[in-house]
Amino acid sequence: KFNKKNRGFEGLAWKADDRMLFVAKERRPSKIFIYQLSPDLLSVKQATIPEELNDIRINDISGLAFNNESLMILSDESRNLLKFNLTEMSFIEMLDLTKGNHSLTSDLPQPEGIVTLSDESIYVASEPDILAKFVPNK
C-alpha cells in the first residue's frame, strides 16, 4: 500500500562509463543523490553532489535520464525538462512541456517518465497514456 504523501525516490539514471547511479527524491525537498559503484558493482559509496545540481528551481522531480554528459531532470508539477551538463556543471537547456511549446497541442498533464536516445531524441511518458517525442534541432 502506498502512502498518500509519497515524497520518496522517484527517478533513476545510470552513467555506465563512470558506474554512477543518480537517484531523485521527489520533493520536500527535491534532491538528487549520486552513488559511485565499484568495478564489480558489488559495493557503493555516495559521491559528492555538485552545488549547481542542488540549486534546482522546480517543484518536484518525477524522472531522470542520462545522455552523453547531460543529466535530464523531469518535473511533473513544473511541467519542465531541465538539461544539466555534468562537464560544464551548469543547466544548459529547459524544455517547457506546456501547450504551444515544441509543437504541443496541449499541456503534458503529468509527465513522469523519460528516456533519451543516442540521436538525442527525447521521449516523455505522461498520464493518461501519453507518449511525446521531442527531436533536437539540427
Q: Where are the language model's segments positioned?
A:
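Sequence/structural signature of beta-propeller domains
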Residues: 1-138
